[in-house]
Structures are given as C-alpha cells and as structure tokens.
C-alpha cells in the first residue's frame, strides 16, 4: 500500500469520511493503540512489519483479529501470500483451527487447484490467486485474514474459490480497513483500525 494509493482511494470513494458506518466494524482493545503506534510510512509505502516485530503488539493484534469470530463456527483460516500467511497462520492457532494457503502467481503448489484472477487493485494490478481444491470442503466455514484491505478484489476472488469448493464464507478480518461500505458489508470485513486513522505521510519518510 502506498501513500499515493491511499490518497487516491480516499478521493474516489469518500468512504473514509463515513464515520458512523465505519465505526460499526472496528474492534477496540490494546491492539488498536499498538497498531497505530508502530505503523510507519517508509518511502511512501505502508510498513506494518514493526507491528510483527514486537511480541506484545503481535499477540494483541492476533487476538483482536480472531476475537469477533471465536464463536462463529470457523473451521479454517485462509491467508493470501505473503503477509496473509503470517497473520492467517497465527489467527488459525488462536482459534484452534487449520490454515489454508492462497498463493499468488506460478509458485509450486501441488495438487488440483482453483484459480482466479482478481479485479484490478488500487495500482491497477490483477493478481492470479490459487487455492488447493482439497483444502476446503462443504463442512468448512472459512475466515480470511490479511493485513490490509483496499478494493477487496483479492478477498472477493478468494471467497469465490471457497464457495466453489462448497465451503461457507465467515468473513474477513484485517489490521487496516480501506474499503468501501458496500464492499465491507459484502465481505463481512472486521478491522482493528481504518486507513483514515493512520498518521499522514509527511512526504519525506
């Protein structure tokens, strides 16, 4: 995520001014303050890695990402390469369920797979996403975990593959929410903070 992309999405959708709608999806705990404290802009790009470096912040964030879905019957957590692997696996352990990987591009991924090409993201890029067909079944209720959601195009592609496998969509839980109210409702997005709450890029760091 870049500072330019953040400004572009804010200007196009206006969704980040819809405080009353946005607040309904926000979780409150120590994780929110820790995420805001450790977030940085580096070269105009969002850097959430410092959150992961701090064990207390990481534990708080993982707990908050899992929190709204503890009693939701989730049977598997899904994560998109690459930060989704880190966060998704941690949330899966927190919930006591297994992890399902979604890979990008042409990396080695054995077995029969489903493939989706996402709609363009905030940079205009379309990602090819792949899911092992055997990883999700009709009895599964799948939660997607990621660090940031902007257009929701990749999350929507993952939902399509999960449902093609016969699985059920539990929702999407992220650290930073930058999507529109309509897409937020469609995907069942829960977040720790919104993009509007992040410190502004100073144009130098």
Write out the residue ranges for each language-model feature.
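PRPP-dependent phosphoribosyltransferase catalytic core
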Residues: 2, 6, 15-19, 23-31, ...
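Active-site-facing substrate-recognition patch
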Residues: 15-74
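Short glycine-rich phosphate-binding loop at a beta-alpha junction
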Residues: 74-81
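Gly/Ser/Thr-rich loops at beta-strand to alpha-helix junctions
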Residues: 81-86, 151
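Short, ordered loop/turn segments at secondary-structure junctions
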Residues: 82, 104-107, 175-178
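Short Gly/Thr/Asp-enriched flexible loops that form oxyanion-binding sites at enzyme active sites
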Residues: 86-95, 158-159
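Short, glycine/charge-rich flexible loops or terminal/linker lids adjacent to PRPP-binding catalytic cores
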Residues: 97-142
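Acidic, divalent-metal-coordinating active-site segment for phosphoryl/phosphodiester hydrolysis
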Residues: 146-156
